[in-house]
Structure formats: C-alpha cells, structure tokens
Amino acid sequence: MRFKKGNRWKNSGGQLRYKTWRKNVFELNKRKIGLSRHYVCIKCNKKRKTTRVLHAHHIFSWDKFKNKRYDKSNGVVLCWKCHNGFHRKYKFEALDNPSLLIEYLGKKGNLVKEYINNDR
C-alpha cells in the first residue's frame, strides 16, 4: 500500500528524513536481536544480509502521529510477505491502532508493547 505524499513530502526534506529513519530502524533491529551481519523480520524470523526485501513498518502511523514519524523506536522490521499480510488483514484499521500490530505479531508483540509503554 502506497500513499502519495506529493510536493509537501518532497519540499520538506521528507525523503531524506524517511530514509534516515528507515536505516535507523534496521540498525536498532539488529542490535535488539543481537546480530551484527543480518537483518531479521520480527514476525517470521527470516534473516537477510541486505534490507532490499525488508520493510520498516511504523508502529504509530506516519500519517496520524506526526510527532513520531521519524522516531527510530517507532518502527519494526517486517519482510515483504509479513508486511503485506499485515496490511491485507487489517487494512486502514491499523493506521491508528498499534494494538493490531501487537495482535498480528503474537508473542513478538512484546517489543511493540515495550515501545508503547516507554512512550507514556
């Protein structure tokens, strides 16, 4: 699912900030998992040496939670298959409801709960 961000996105430096956020989410994922050479999907545990087939997914929606957009803790790493599976299952309900991500991740949802609890 892609959102058109338009000129507001381009003119605000959003592309660079987003790329930096994405990179930081991947690096934080590696540290939390304890790996130095691989990136891991939080849902299915598939390891990848590159981020090409992995997605950084916002816990709190990019669109609705502007103050959390570029917070590196506001992201989890999902492989393409798991990321699309999440959005197919929950569609737009998930945009402002992080508890759906926790439900989708099952036991791994504790990492998301940890972020939400630390944010309060």
Protein language model annotation of sequence segments:
Residues H58-K64, A94-E103:
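Short cysteine/histidine-rich metal-coordination sites, predominantly Zn2+-binding motifs
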Residues F60-N74:
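Short linker/helix segments within small regulatory modules
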Residues V40, H55, L78:
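The −1 position to Zn-ligating cysteines in a subset of zinc-ribbon hairpins
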Residues N97-R120:
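Charged phosphate-binding loop/patch that engages nucleotide di/tri-phosphates or the phosphate backbone
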Residues T50-A56:
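Canonical RING-type zinc finger of E3 ubiquitin-protein ligases
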Residues N45, F60, H83:
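Cys/His-coordinated zinc-binding microdomains
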Residues K5-K43, N67-R69:
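Short, charged surface segments at domain edges that flank catalytic/cofactor-binding sites
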Residues K49, G75-D96:
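Short Cys/His-centered divalent metal-binding micro-motifs
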